[in-house]
């Protein structure tokens, strides 16, 4: 294999040769902002500053592969009239058919996309670059003039999957004399999954970056939930 560094205008997101996931998690945990608040109630800073009992902790998650039940698969068939049929488990049929039309030059009306429920989805079957075998199946079917069914190996699946980004969340909490929480602060340093697909932070906070943190109904009078956006 002859490896090449991507050019400045490349859409490929390269991984540096010296990349370390442990070092990246440390970098996230030490990032101080700026942070965007999703929830901010009461006076968290004042309560934390005056509390007799305070708890500080940092938690993180690792890169997550979708790990679906079956490896990705696709079947492509060009019909005698030049139309194309593709069998492909997916979560966005219109987007996939538009992408297939762009790749083949066919009018979308001449493309039939069958969407069988295969493999378990978990977000794996959205439209990601190079994460599905259907472009290969289409090219092979066109080349040999016959239907082609393609099933990736587990190695291919894990190599080409889009991983959920890592996150480091710094928690601070203040407790009263009976051990009940008076205040909690959770600041997540991460690039949310939706932000990772877009390649940038949107005008609004990415809810997938704060899953499990925001929108909770605990009766804590002072709370702050925020995100520090760090592009991965």
What is each PLM-predicted segment?
Residues 1-232:
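Structural alpha/beta core scaffold segments of enzyme domains
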């Amino acid at each position: 294999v002859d490896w090449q560094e991507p050019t400045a205008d490349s859409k490929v997101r390269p991984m540096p040769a010296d990349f370390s996931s442990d070092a990246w998690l440390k970098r996230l945990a030490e990032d101080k902002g700026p942070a965007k608040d999703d929830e901010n109630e009461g006076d968290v800073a004042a309560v934390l500053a005056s509390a007799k009992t305070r708890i500080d902790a940092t938690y993180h998650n690792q890169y997550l592969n979708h790990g679906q039940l079956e490896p990705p698969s696709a079947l492509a068939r060009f019909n005698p009239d030049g139309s194309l049929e593709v069998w492909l488990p997916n979560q966005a049929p219109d987007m996939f058919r538009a992408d297939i039309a762009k790749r083949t030059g066919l009018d979308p009306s001449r493309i039939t996309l069958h969407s069988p429920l295969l493999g378990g989805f978990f977000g794996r079957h959205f439209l990601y670059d190079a994460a599905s075998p259907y472009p290969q199946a289409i090219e092979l079917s066109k080349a040999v003039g016959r239907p082609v069914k393609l099933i990736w190996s587990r190695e291919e699946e894990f190599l080409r999957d889009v991983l959920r980004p890592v996150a480091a969340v710094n928690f601070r909490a203040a407790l009263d004399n009976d051990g009940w929480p008076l205040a909690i602060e959770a600041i997540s340093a991460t690039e949310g999954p939706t932000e990772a697909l877009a390649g940038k932070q949107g005008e609004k906070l990415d809810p997938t970056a704060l899953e499990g943190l925001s929108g909770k109904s605990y009766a804590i009078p002072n709370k702050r939930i925020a995100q520090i956006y760090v592009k991965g």
